[in-house]
Structure formats: C-alpha cells, structure tokens
Amino acid sequence: VKIGKVPETVLKRSVFKQIRKRQKEVLTKPGIGHDYSGIEASSQDVITIATAPVSGAIDDIGPIAVHMAVNNLVLSGATPLGIMQTMLLPEGFREAELKIIIKAIEAQCLLLNIEVMGGHTEVSAAVNCPVLVITGLGKVKKTQMLSPANIIAGQEIVMTKWAGIKGTYLLAKDHESELISRYNRDFIQGAKDLLKYLSVSKDAKAAADFGVTAMHDAARGGIFAALWEFAEAAKMGLKVYLKKIGLKQETVEICNYFNINPYQMTSEGSLLIAVGKGDLLVDHLRKQGIEASVIGQFMEGNDRLIINDDEIRYLEPPRTDEIYKVI
C-alpha cells in the first residue's frame, strides 16, 4: 500500500467489512466520507467524536492536528467542546520541543474556545518523528445533527475558500529555499500565510445556522477526493464544474512549479456543503467574510462527473495525495 490514505477498496474489504454494530446508543457507523461518530447522550443530545493523525515538524504538528480533528467534528453541526491528545515521540526528543508542541496545541484550543481534556505522551523506538493523534469531542441536538445520508438529488454543492490550502502552505514552508529562486519573498509569504485558513469551524457554524443538509471537509487527496467521498457517503452521483473551484494564485504557481495537480493536493481549510439553495448560502457565507461558490450538484445514480467547458470526464476514486510527489 502506498503512502497516504489507504485505498477505498482496501478499507471496504479489510476494515469496514469486519466491523459490526453492537450499541444502540452509537448512531453512526464507519464508512467512506463519514468523518465523525455520534453517541446518544440523552433523548435530545448527541455527543460527537472525530479523530485525526499528523506526523512531522514540531512547529506544524500541533495546529494542523487540532484543526483536522475539529474540522471533522463540526461537520456534524456540533459545537466542539474539547480534545484528547496521544503523542508518540522519537528517542532523543527534547523536553523543550515537547513544550513547543503543547504550547501550539493550547494556543489553537484557545482560538477555538475548547479544552485540552487529557491524553497520553510517550517516547517510542517505533517512530522517527513526532506522531500526534487528536480526538475531538462536541455536542449537538439530535434534531440538528447533519448526515450525508439525507442528501437528495438536485441539491447543490457549495465550496468554501480554495483548493490546495494546506498543500500550498507546506510546499512554501518546506521548499522556501528552492522557490525563492523563482518567486519573491512576498509571494512565498502569501503562500505560507494560508496556514491561518486551515480551520473550517467558522464556515461550518455559518452553514449550520443557515440550514444545510450535510458537510464534508477537503483533506488528504484534495478536492477531488473530498467530492468522491461526499458522493460515496450520500450514495449519489454528482456533477462539478472545474472552473467554479476556487484556486489561489500561489497554489496555481507552486503546483505548476512542482508539476502537481492542485485538485488532488491536501486541502484542509476548504468545506463542501450540500444545500437546496446554493446561491443563498453563498451570500450568507460571504456576508460573514467567508469566500464561497456553487461548484455543482448531486444527482441520481453513480456517475460522478467533472465538467470543464465542453470536456466531461469521470471523477475517479481518491489517489495518493499529490504532495507526496514532493515531500
């Protein structure tokens, strides 16, 4: 199996096929495009849970992991409450570096108004860089919990922000010394500044307040992977207009430089939303300072189409994230 997400066929055959449901209080089950689980806490309330793993540099790992977990959590329509963290550190890892990671985690939790509720930290010979797993918990009214299972044909797909947000940031940060030979420092800084857009909490709250059917965030594999997963979870087809998908100029330039596809590059920070009246939702989001556009709609059947002017092609199951060609 290649680096990145385990292929959908493997997940279905070797993971999901073996899992059985036992507890009636557990309202959701694992599946493609299912980003969170829900546990019935009372006749009215549901506790939602989501998890996300990250490995890498100490200055990135905390903020990225927190946002990935909370991003998955808020897709249910839930208000996030707190996180648990599990961290595996390589031998020789310094206490000062651990402090940096925890400080960054706490800083992101402060911004999101959530608690660090606990966790586990250990040094392991099995890893050669820090590995951080964040589990987020939240709460939502049962009547307000969102699910892709409720999507119907004809509903529109609204996308917030732009494709390739996280990938552009990582490439600009990790390859700055190489990119500086072609682009000026302001351009590279603009790409690195995309880190501040990784959270979809504001997007999701605005969408939930408006009244939408379901949401799915774009993460590993990019916008194309997210669209496929959204359609899988909904058991629907879709058609998407390529030119409606937002791209920052920094993303276009850097992807061209490295010869990678921005639509298949990690895109944390962008949210896909299923809604009846996409234009009205876009207006609602833009009034709150969130860039958004209608990029397509769901339809009956299994066809998942990408339309680029007169060219129509089929969306394929997610591939290895394009960023692994470079980092």
Q: Predicted regions span which residues?
A:
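Extreme N-terminal cap/leader segments of soluble proteins
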Residues: 1-57, 85, 106-110, 114, ...
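Acidic, Ser/Thr/Pro-rich beta/coil linker or hinge segments at domain junctions
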Residues: 2-3, 7-11, 288-327
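Glycine-rich anion-binding loops of enzyme active sites
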Residues: 42-50, 54, 79-176, 297
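Small-aliphatic-rich amphipathic alpha-helix that forms the alpha element of a beta-alpha
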Residues: 58-83, 100-111, 199-206, 225-229
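Active-site-proximal betaalpha loop/short-helix elements
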Residues: 90-92, 191-267
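Active-site glycine-rich loop that binds ribose-phosphate moieties when present
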Residues: 133-147, 182-206
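Helix N-cap motif at beta-to-alpha junctions
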Residues: 274-280
